């Protein structure tokens, strides 16, 4: 390729499997729209006294010729995972390269391999932003900044302590990413999520429990309730913001814990009002700023102090997303890390759609059966019995002899096992008896009554 800068030719052949990854990565960069003269292969730097030097695979510069991105290529899975563990341990090769190109804004660990079964190239990437997020530093001035780091070890400590070893797996080669604009601050339902399948349930449940154990979360009942709240937020988000998802962690380069929780609170308020008819108190950051309109011309310490008090009341008390008890900023950040892992577990999946999806119902049934203690007066009917009872109903006769959709009512619905089982059987019956392909009218005739708020919420969310 004319204009491509080649400093050495160790990777300009296919003698090693890793070289094929470099070739494929360069092809992607060119295909994306990066100019050849901005792509440099095997830039070499001296790594220290007595060191033989270091050689990165790919250096990408911006339009001004400044270093923008350093890419280290590895073979798929095993070598990639090892390199990523090394990076998390002490910075690995990636952070040693930053020391030589201090103006670099991003570093990336990249791997690719041909998948014979799908006839496509699978990729792995970990993109680390090494530029500061002003919002994160503003929220907590005590945190160290990349701008003040003087060496490799200090930069790694900033990444570890301030940005929590944050890395993203998208933001370089996706269709809605422009060249030279690395990272994403906007995610869309159709491009950044995939339909969830029932086969994901076991792995998802295992990951959920692993996160709880990792952070010593012992209140499983409470954790399940928070999970239901998160699902409610995600459903609202998919229905209301398909082109700019709020239920998505954008990475420390573009997001902060406070902004994330604020978005969740807003989605939760909308969901509780729309689906459960409950008015939830929600004070947005904009509401807080608006309360001080009279002080805009004369900002002072009093305003900052009142804002801090607002923040403590808003974020540190009575959260609907508490996996652990939050009473101050330390525990808020600790809880936010758990919350973040839960969100990242689900953000890439799509829960809503035109086709019936039994995932939520199956998931909640499994969680209730395995992780929630039944308190006095609450008894959950086992799923096989629900299936048997619903199957014993004369549904075919009722559907055939009623011109209007038949109504179904469970006046003590609990978590909605009977209702979801009934809803699952309806489509096949109406298609066979009345040649109706869309069961929406029949779904609107399904009702449940439950006095316990938590279970009513579970039943409502499971119905999606």
Mark where each language-model region is.
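Acidic-basic catalytic patches of nuclease active cores, encompassing PD-(D/E)XK
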Residues: 2-44
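Long recognition/docking surfaces used for binding and targeting
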Residues: 232, 239-369
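Nucleic-acid nuclease catalytic cores
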Residues: 81-138, 142-145
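Conserved catalytic cores of phosphodiester-cleaving nucleases, focusing on short active-site segments
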Residues: 25, 56-62, 67-80, 97
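Conserved S-adenosyl-L-methionine
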Residues: 381-464
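Active-site metal-binding core of divalent-cation-utilizing nuclease and nuclease-like domains
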Residues: 11-14, 37-65
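Active-site-adjacent loop/helix micro-motif of nuclease/hydrolase catalytic cores
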Residues: 37, 50-53, 67-70, 78-91
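Non-catalytic accessory regions of SAM-dependent methyltransferases
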Residues: 163-249
